[in-house]
Amino acid sequence: MAEIPEMTVQELKALMDSGAQDYVLVDVRNPNEYEIARIPGSVLVPLSEIENGPGVEKIRSLLNGHRLLVHCKMGGPLPKRWASSKRLALRESISKGASTLGVRKSTPAYPPTNPRLGAGRRKGMLRYMNFLEEKHALSRAIAALPRITT
């Protein structure tokens, strides 16, 4: 199977700024993480659903000839782990590891602790929230995309 390319946050922003509408952004994190912070316009299909089968059909139904962009909290091998299962033909993957490297300023609007997350995961989510705040143009661009109903 061919190597699945990764996409940086800057490349995603450029894609969104271009007005392209030929892709579906799938978030494979768990529902609690998705509830806390998400890229507007992304569709939640947890990795557990993909690995157990029903998520595969959900993603296939969303594609309709569009490119599939996948992001998760861990980045690197995680999106590739299920992509290489050969149940889906993926063309692109977003490295969540890269997207968590946003500006690390404090975020007063986001609580510094969350009982649902461990200490290390809280830090990652705070970095993710900082990234979303700093890249508000990215959020506006995603919000302008047509909504996908499931």
From Swiss-Prot:
Pfam families: Rhodanese. InterPro entries: Rhodanese-like_dom (IPR001763), Rhodanese-like_dom_sf (IPR036873). Residues 19-93 form the Rhodanese domain. SUPFAM superfamilies: Rhodanese/Cell cycle control phosphatase. This is Uncharacterized 16.5 kDa protein in psaL 5'region. The lineage of its organism: Bacteria, Bacillati, Cyanobacteriota, Cyanophyceae, Synechococcales.
